[in-house]
């Protein structure tokens, strides 16, 4: 089973448990760390995630995963809030966090200054969506507005502003 297949299976198992309690699955990671494997769930809920909420989800999901057994190898389950630098994984996230500073990594190089020097990583203020494209006001280009097709985004997360 590929890692993507494992992640998809975990998402399909976990989503109903979270949605039943009004919680959101922000992201899922399954990776080798140190001597073993970690299955990490990032969750959110209105008003923020508490330690009690993480513990409750860990218990409920832990029992579910014991029964369903979607992963062949031994692993540790961790449940966490997404943090201040939360990943942006859904199209709605870019609308929800409009006005916030974000770092966006594109799958393809984009030439923003017309000099033929494309780049893939951009930091700017999220300005919402336009026809399925993420609108970003670049911090290093005096607010230059650019659009990146959602499907071209490899990774994105909120940035902590100081």
Swiss-Prot record:
Lineage top rank: taxon: Bacteria
Instruction: Answer yes or no on keyword Nucleotidyltransferase.
Output: no
Q: What Gene3D superfamilies does the record tag this protein with?
A: Ribosome maturation factor RimP, C-terminal domain (2.30.30.180), RimP-like superfamily, N-terminal (3.30.300.70)
Q: Which UniProt keywords apply?
A: Cytoplasm, Ribosome biogenesis
- Transferase as a keyword of this entry, yes or no, is no
Q: Give the UniProt subcellular location, in the record's own words.
A: Cytoplasm
Q: Name one GO biological process term.
A: ribosomal small subunit assembly
| Residue ranges of coiled coil | none
Pfam families from the UniProt entry? DUF150_C, RimP_N
Q: InterPro entries per the record?
A: Ribosome_maturation_RimP, RimP_C, RimP_C_sf, RimP_N, RimP_N_sf
GO cellular component terms? cytosol
Q: What function does the entry list?
A: Required for maturation of 30S ribosomal subunits.
Of which family is this protein a member?
Belongs to the RimP family.
Q: Which HAMAP family match?
A: RimP
Q: What is this protein called?
A: Ribosome maturation factor RimP
Q: Which organism is it from?
A: Syntrophotalea carbinolica (strain DSM 2380 / NBRC 103641 / GraBd1)
């Amino acid at each position: 089973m590929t890692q993507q297949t494992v992640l998809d299976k975990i998402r399909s198992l976990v989503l109903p448990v979270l949605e039943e309690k009004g919680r959101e699955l922000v992201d899922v990671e399954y990776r080798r760390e140190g001597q073993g494997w970690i299955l990490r769930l990032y969750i959110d809920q209105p008003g923020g995630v508490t330690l009690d909420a993480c513990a409750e989800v860990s218990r409920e999901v832990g029992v579910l995963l014991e029964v369903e057994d979607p992963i062949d190898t031994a692993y540790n389950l961790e449940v966490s809030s997404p943090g201040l630098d939360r990943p942006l994984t859904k199209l709605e996230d870019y609308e929800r966090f409009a006005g916030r500073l974000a770092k966006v990594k594109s799958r393809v190089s984009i030439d923003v200054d017309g000099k033929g020097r494309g780049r893939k990583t951009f930091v700017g203020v999220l300005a919402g969506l336009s026809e399925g494209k993420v609108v970003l006001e670049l911090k290093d280009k005096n607010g230059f507005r650019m659009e990146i097709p959602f499907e071209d985004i490899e990774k994105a997360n909120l940035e902590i502003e100081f």
